[in-house]
């Protein structure tokens, strides 16, 4: 559905975060007199009133009855379509779409293809991978957009001039389904990995996997690039796409610190500022994508050495009194915390875990702690007591020290005391979202930096967002 098709219909926007505001501006630019209603909270309603838009109404109660009055509801990604009020309204005929679907419909050609569009998704690593892809495409001399879930809504860059040669688009599981619903077919879709996440939004693990994979199953990209090492991806049948693989011995893969293409050693990653084996494996994914686009990936590989790591992702803030502080606030799953820990296997580490409870299973994390644990673990947040109870038997058996904190400030004090004069690493890798305590993971990372004695401004914006 293109924006022009909304003209004359009853249309509402649900959500007034950055995505909601981007949708409003895009619709207002194309449809300046279209009547719109925004469902938002009371504080946001006051902000909207200040716009003095006579064709814009505000409602603060998004009930099934209220939503059902509209033919079209443009929904922000964070609002689940599986909520009861959305399901009831949809059953009564309301069409729910996202800004991602509108953007893809606007850019699709007559046959549905969207040349130059590369979509990246996965449970972890997708932001760094998308940014690294844009970095290499720009290194090859191509004007490239770095947009999407990474920090710039697609509708903020609806029609940049001159248009980019490539679009590197990060998509969350909240957005992947929009691609197929738009009828558009990306040139390439890259799926890095799949672990359970966002179960509160999706409802259960099976639906999460289905929604995530809809990028390739329903989006039908020209090229589907998949991780051969992920069992949930290895068995996929995608008859409408050319399927390519990374992390496979016949293609781009990692051996130690060296990237190989088949049996040919291509590039030593020792000088690449990508902490962790998982990030170096994702470099293989980027090189496979570049090659699939017809570029010389081997020649571009050394450009990865000039990539600037993203903030809040295994970000070393510095050291104070023998203790290094690492900000991995982006970590929202237990698997992400395990990947972060693996980067510091030989160090004295105090790990801070816990946050908003989405019901994720921490048993795999606990099993790994029985085999190779940090020196200390500090639990915090809404799911902190649940994690603490799961880890307590291992701590009592002497695998690690275990502490319970009321909040991040308390956790920092416990971590410092536990490391003592010998020093080590305080690693914030919560394995859980920040909701409830912070507005987002960036705010959590900034607070961590402040508590560690660093300027919160060190949690800088992501380099290269937008079209360059």
Swiss-Prot record:
InterPro entries linked: Folylpolyglutamate_synth_CS (IPR018109), Mur-like_cat_sf (IPR036565), Mur_ligase_C_dom_sf (IPR036615), Mur_ligase_cen (IPR013221), MurD (IPR005762), MurD2 (IPR043687)
EC supergroup of this enzyme: ligase
GO aspect biological process, one term: cell wall organization
EC id: 6.3.2.53
Pfam families per record: Mur_ligase_M
Binding site for ATP: 122-128
Keywords of this entry: ATP-binding, Cell cycle, Cell division, Cell shape, Cell wall biogenesis/degradation, Cytoplasm, Ligase, Nucleotide-binding, Peptidoglycan synthesis
UniProt GO cellular component terms: cytoplasm
Pathway it works in: Cell wall biogenesis; peptidoglycan biosynthesis
Catalyzed reaction equations: UDP-N-acetyl-alpha-D-muramoyl-L-alanine + L-glutamate + ATP = UDP-N-acetyl-alpha-D-muramoyl-L-alanyl-L-glutamate + ADP + phosphate + H(+)
Molecular function per GO: ATP binding; tetrahydrofolylpolyglutamate synthase activity; UDP-N-acetylmuramoylalanine-D-glutamate ligase activity
Chief localisation class: cytoplasm
Location in or out of the cell: Cytoplasm
Family statement drawn from the similarity comment of this UniProt entry: Belongs to the MurCDEF family. MurD2 subfamily.
Free-text function comment from the UniProt entry: Cell wall formation. Catalyzes the addition of L-glutamate to the nucleotide precursor UDP-N-acetylmuramoyl-L-alanine.
NCBIfam families recorded: murD
Name of the featured protein: UDP-N-acetylmuramoyl-L-alanine--L-glutamate ligase
């Amino acid at each position: 559905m293109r924006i022009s098709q909304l003209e004359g219909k009853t249309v509402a926007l649900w959500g007034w975060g950055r995505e909601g505001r981007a949708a409003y501006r895009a619709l207002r630019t194309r449809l300046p007199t279209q009547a719109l209603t925004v469902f938002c909270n009371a504080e946001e309603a006051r902000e909207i009133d200040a716009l003095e838009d006579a064709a814009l109404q505000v409602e603060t109660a998004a009930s099934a009855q209220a939503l059902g009055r509209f033919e079209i509801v443009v929904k922000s990604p964070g609002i689940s379509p599986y909520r009861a009020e959305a399901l009831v309204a949809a059953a009564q005929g309301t069409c729910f779409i996202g800004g991602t679907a509108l953007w893809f419909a606007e850019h699709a050609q007559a046959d549905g293809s969207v040349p130059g569009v590369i979509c990246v998704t996965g449970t972890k690593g997708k932001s760094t991978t998308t940014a690294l892809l844009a970095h290499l495409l720009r290194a090859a001399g191509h004007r490239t957009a770095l947009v999407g879930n990474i920090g710039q809504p697609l509708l903020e860059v609806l029609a940049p001039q001159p248009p980019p040669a490539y679009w590197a688009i990060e998509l969350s599981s909240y957005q992947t389904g929009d691609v197929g619903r738009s009828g558009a077919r990306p040139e390439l879709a890259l799926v890095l990995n799949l672990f359970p996440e966002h179960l509160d939004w999706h409802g259960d693990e099976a639906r999460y996997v289905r929604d995530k994979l809809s990028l390739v199953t329903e989006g039908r990209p020209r090229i589907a690039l998949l991780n051969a090492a992920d069992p949930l991806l290895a068995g996929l049948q995608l008859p409408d796409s050319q399927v390519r693989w990374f992390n496979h011995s016949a293609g781009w893969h990692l051996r130690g610190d060296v990237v190989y293409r088949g049996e040919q050693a291509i590039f030593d990653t020792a000088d690449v500022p990508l902490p962790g084996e998982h990030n170096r494996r994702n470099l293989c994914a980027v090189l496979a994508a570049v090659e699939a686009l017809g570029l010389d990936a081997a020649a571009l590989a050394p450009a990865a050495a000039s990539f600037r790591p993203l903030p809040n992702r295994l970000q070393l803030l510095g050291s104070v009194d023998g203790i290094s502080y690492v900000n991995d606030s982006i970590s929202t799953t237990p698997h992400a915390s395990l990947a972060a820990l693996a980067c510091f296997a030989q160090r004295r580490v105090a790990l801070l875990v816990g946050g908003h409870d989405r019901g994720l299973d921490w048993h795999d994390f606990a099993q790994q702690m029985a085999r190779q644990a940090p020196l200390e673990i500090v639990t915090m947040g809404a799911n902190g007591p649940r994690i603490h109870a799961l880890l307590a038997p291992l701590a009592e058996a002497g695998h690690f020290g275990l502490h319970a904190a009321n909040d991040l400030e308390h956790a920092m004090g416990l971590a410092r005391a536990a490391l003592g004069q010998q020093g080590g690493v305080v690693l914030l890798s919560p394995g859980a979202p920040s909701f409830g305590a912070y507005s987002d993971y960036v705010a959590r990372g900034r607070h961590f930096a402040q508590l560690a004695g660093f300027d919160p401004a060190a949690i800088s914006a992501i380099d290269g967002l937008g079209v360059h």
